[in-house]
């Protein structure tokens, strides 16, 4: 993190820090925005970690960019509704957001333990309170074939290609969502 900040300062580069999942990780490092507030656009949201329907988030940025960011925000027309903003602010102020976050962390922690037990002996990546598990797929499968086979067996997974930035060489895999409970 410190090295990234040094490089950004040396080359006068701005940093965009997406911490939408961060609140679910109690031991995460301090945000880069804390190390380099003069060049970091930091955003987080209540949507990912508190409640999906609560489409409300926060953006902090260097003061010099506030006007430009506000103008672009209005142009893109991505705005929280007044009701969602009011609910989000009240929940933060009265402690409801913190209680819901703790509940979510507990529920996801249990689901991650179940996933680890089921996937025992299979290499996978996850975070203790994370909402997703990354599962590399065996070389004999394509992502599409694996996804189709999983769905035929009642398991919904997303192909890694849905999250790739390019078609460059990458590890084939699927993302398993632990955030939605099925009945």
Describe these PLM feature segments.
Residues 41-106:
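Conserved core segment of the aminotransferase class I/II
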Residues 152-153, 167-183:
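PLP-dependent enzyme catalytic core of the Aspartate aminotransferase-like
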Residues 60, 134-138, 177-179:
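Short hydrophobic/aromatic beta-strand micro-patches
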Residues 1-14, 19-51:
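Active-site pre-lysine segment of PLP-dependent enzymes
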């Amino acid at each position: 993190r410190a090295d990234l900040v040094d490089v950004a300062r040396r080359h006068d580069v701005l940093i965009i820090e997406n911490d939408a999942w961060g609140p679910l990780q109690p031991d995460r490092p301090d945000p880069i925005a804390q190390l380099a507030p003069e060049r970091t656009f930091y955003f987080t949201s209540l949507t990912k970690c508190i409640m999906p329907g609560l489409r409300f988030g926060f953006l902090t940025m260097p003061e010099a960019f506030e006007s430009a960011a506000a103008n672009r925000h209005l142009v893109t027309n991505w705005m929280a509704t007044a009701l969602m903003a009011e609910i989000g602010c009240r929940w933060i102020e009265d402690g409801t957001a913190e209680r819901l976050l703790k509940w979510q962390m507990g529920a996801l922690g249990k689901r991650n333990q179940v996933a680890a037990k089921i996937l025992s002996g299979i290499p996978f990546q996850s975070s203790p309170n994370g909402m997703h598990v990354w599962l590399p797929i065996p070389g004999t499968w394509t992502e599409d074939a694996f996804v189709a086979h999983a769905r035929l067996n009642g398991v919904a997974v997303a192909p890694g290609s849905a999250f790739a930035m390019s078609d460059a060489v990458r590890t084939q895999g699927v993302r398993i969502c632990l955030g939605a409970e099925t009945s």
